[in-house]
Amino acid sequence: MDRSLFSLFGHGVLRFAALGVATLGFVGSSPGIPAGGAKPEDDWRLLEPVTYENLTVFPVVSASGHDTRAFLTLEEALSSGEIIVREQGAETIVRNRDRNRPVPRGYGAPSVNQLVLINRSKRPLMLLAGELVSGGKQDRIIAKDRIVPPGAEPLPLDVFCVEHGRWSNGAQFSAANTIVHPSVREQAAVKQNQSDVWASVTAGSVATESLAAPPAAAPRMSADAINEAVRTEAPTQSYNKIYNSRAIGGSVDSFVEEVQRRFRRETSGLKGERVVGVVIAYGGEVAWSDIFASGELFDQYWNKLLRSYAVEALARPTLREKASSEDAREFLRRLNGRETTESEPGVYRWLEISEGSLSQIELDALQPKTITLHRLVLRRTS
């Protein structure tokens, strides 16, 4: 099922298109040498790579960063009850402006690709494509990076389903502390197609092996293991249940523990710098990066990001070839290609740049000043 990029909802919630583009960028640097840009936000460098089996993680560190404490993450907000997520069409209770009485509102019939979100906190909510919310009629993932302002009207939220076999009332939506692995996240963030999201959930990895690549060992996470997990523990094809199942979850856990141990060892001696992101390679191919505006923000996402990278690594063939630091620096150059923007004035701007097989996506907060909260670069698999 293809999802429409723009829709009209209820009482006229509008999407805005912005003509401007994000101006904050990141420039690669040699280990130990600050980046070439003079701006504080460009002052970062790559540490030595952390490698385990077919996964290589290049830590990105910075001596400067933005204060991001004003922003609320999905996990924080759901755990504290500062946001409410409901199925579209369910009665949603909100307070009117004078806060004297509740006002019931409905937003049409339930929809696979739409939820309703209310930000009741005093902080803007940051959402990343691929973050999972569990419950409702089926588990969903956030469709696109965005910011939800505090005190806003109930928001029709674009999502993708990652539980193909269920459409029935379940528990209230809750924090899953999960972001789907890159093969699934790409389908949401770039391709924006529900059928492709469903297919990628049970495919493991959708990356295709290059004909020029050297011979590789079979993936540790086989199609048979995924099918067994679906058969025995995840009959509704729930992403969360598949990748936390006995057939798969144990392998992911041990993989994550070893990478985390090596990562901590590499980053433990930092003085005056913080890890703000990572560049990810599988075998010799640099494939992915997530960089944040501050070390604090990176820390909040790191555990679930690492698990997502590990799932992808286990689903890909094991190649002996390793990516170099120069490969990672080249991968992080600012792209020069077709640009697409979306914006909510005074709240956020979303920018995508496409060049060849690469996509760069930036989420800018526009208040209290313009900063790039998150920057994603990925090598598309199709």
Locate predicted features.
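Bacterial N-terminal signal peptides that target proteins for export
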Residues: D2-A18
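Intrinsically disordered, low-complexity segments enriched in small/polar residues
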Residues: S30-L125, G130-S382
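Hydrophobic h-region of N-terminal signal peptides that target proteins for export
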Residues: V21-S30
